[in-house]
């Protein structure tokens, strides 16, 4: 081991190894597919509690609601949704 070395493999050696690409050829597409399914199925909306695009506005509304009282905004929006 050379002086000042941390004992880790050089990055270039890692990314040129067959073992690295065998592992990552499976994991990287799997992460992408899992993320795509998480968003496309709507599970992301449920997990984070955000409204779905079709529920932002009611059908009778033509513009976004305006909150007039800063500290009573939740009550105003809840009243709007009833």
From Swiss-Prot:
Localization: Cellular thylakoid membrane
Cofactor section: heme b
GO biological process terms held by the UniProt record: photosynthetic electron transport chain
Spans traversing the lipid bilayer: 22-36
Major subcellular site: membrane
Membrane disposition: Single-pass membrane protein
Textual note on the cofactor: With its partner (PsbF) binds heme. PSII binds additional chlorophylls, carotenoids and specific lipids.
Keyword presence, RNA-binding: no
Binding site for heme: 24
Single GO cellular component term: photosystem II
Superkingdom of source: Bacteria
Example of a GO MF term: iron ion binding
Keywords in alphabetical order: Electron transport, Heme, Iron, Membrane, Metal-binding, Photosynthesis, Photosystem II, Thylakoid, Transmembrane, Transmembrane helix, Transport
HAMAP family: PSII_PsbE (MF_00642)
UniProt similarity note: Belongs to the PsbE/PsbF family.
Subunit text: Heterodimer of an alpha subunit and a beta subunit. PSII is composed of 1 copy each of membrane proteins PsbA, PsbB, PsbC, PsbD, PsbE, PsbF, PsbH, PsbI, PsbJ, PsbK, PsbL, PsbM, PsbT, PsbX, PsbY, Psb30/Ycf12, peripheral proteins PsbO, CyanoQ (PsbQ), PsbU, PsbV and a large number of cofactors. It forms dimeric complexes.
Free-text function comment from the UniProt entry: This b-type cytochrome is tightly associated with the reaction center of photosystem II (PSII). PSII is a light-driven water:plastoquinone oxidoreductase that uses light energy to abstract electrons from H(2)O, generating O(2) and a proton gradient subsequently used for ATP formation. It consists of a core antenna complex that captures photons, and an electron transfer chain that converts photonic excitation into a charge separation.
NCBIfam families: cyt_b559_alpha
Name of the protein in question: Cytochrome b559 subunit alpha
Lineage of the organism: Bacteria, Bacillati, Cyanobacteriota, Cyanophyceae, Synechococcales
């Amino acid at each position: 081991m050379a002086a000042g070395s941390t004992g880790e493999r050089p990055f270039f050696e890692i990314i040129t190894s067959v073992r690295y690409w065998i592992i990552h050829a499976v994991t990287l597409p799997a992460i992408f597919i899992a993320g795509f399914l998480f968003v496309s199925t709507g599970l992301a909306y449920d997990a984070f509690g955000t409204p779905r695009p079709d529920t932002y506005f009611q059908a009778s509304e033509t513009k976004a609601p305006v909150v007039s009282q800063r500290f009573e905004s939740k009550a105003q929006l809840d009243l709007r949704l009833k």
